[in-house]
Amino acid sequence: MMPLALSAQHTFSIVAIDSITGEIGSAGATCGDSIIWPGTPGAILISDVIPGIGAIHTQSYYTENNQLNAHNRMLAGDSPEEIINWLVANDVSSNPSIRQYGIIDFNNGSPRSAGFTGENCFDYKNHVLGLNYAIQGNILLGQQIIDSMESGFNNTSGCLSDKLMGAMQGANVVGADTRCMSEGTSSLSAFLRVAKPGDDPNAIFIDLNIAGTPQGIEPLDELLIKYNNWKNNNNYDCSTQGIIESLDESETILIYPNPAGNIIYIQRNGIPLSKIEISDLTGKTILNQNISEPKTTLEIEVGHLKNGEYFITSFAQGSLVSNNKFTISSNN
């Protein structure tokens, strides 16, 4: 059998991790389905979730061998950034400029994300990274689709699956994939998947797929219906859960100044902070500092860092208490 390769693009998707529960998630949609691509299950084709380890989306001119190579590199212990670097250097068609990738891994509870958007992917194209997620898309209506997905993920309360659905509903706009403008929908097929640690990769906790819909029927609406039915049938209510446990108002984390220059302050009104980690947008750890005498206010030297955006993760008594983003704008 010849390896499967699709000249079609896959558009908007997200991979994400709950660092507390160890759940790993994957969701996406495209203006292609099992009818346009006979013998395929639709957009879910791009999803590779490895329970307890991470998730990979290989999209835009999907090629099965690129996906398999990424899978094997993750099993070998490569970080998301290392996997992408390897894929770019070893593209099966020697043409990484047409590919798009989003990768996340659990990394013992300190998630790492990485993305890649080739210059020859169809516009509009982009990706955005968070500490525990990667969102990517091509042939989009515009940056607003990526932004709305990110907002939907970050602002939806509940567990990982709820937040993934929030991200997907953020793209529930006619023509989100511009090829579907004439259909009056965002896409033609969609999926949402979540694996718990220890799941069989072929039988993960949540595995929902809309392989295709009749003309004019919105796949993201159908996916939401299917998800709500799944929750009802399984008596699953995670509305009070959260990827990071909510802090009491008395334990708010303050980071200032932001944007920062040479010094940044981290303040917590509660149990003193015992450790902080700073990472760049690829998930690479820049600073990992244990606090010998835990304090409620930390002064961190960041003058050696280049201008740009960074993530800072704060710990107290060995537990993660906050993930925040900050900007450095005045260093050379």
Where are these regions (language model features)?
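N-terminal hydrophobic or amphipathic segments with adjacent small-residue motifs
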Residues: M2, A16-S19, E277, V302
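C-terminal outer-membrane/trafficking sorting elements
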Residues: S246-N332
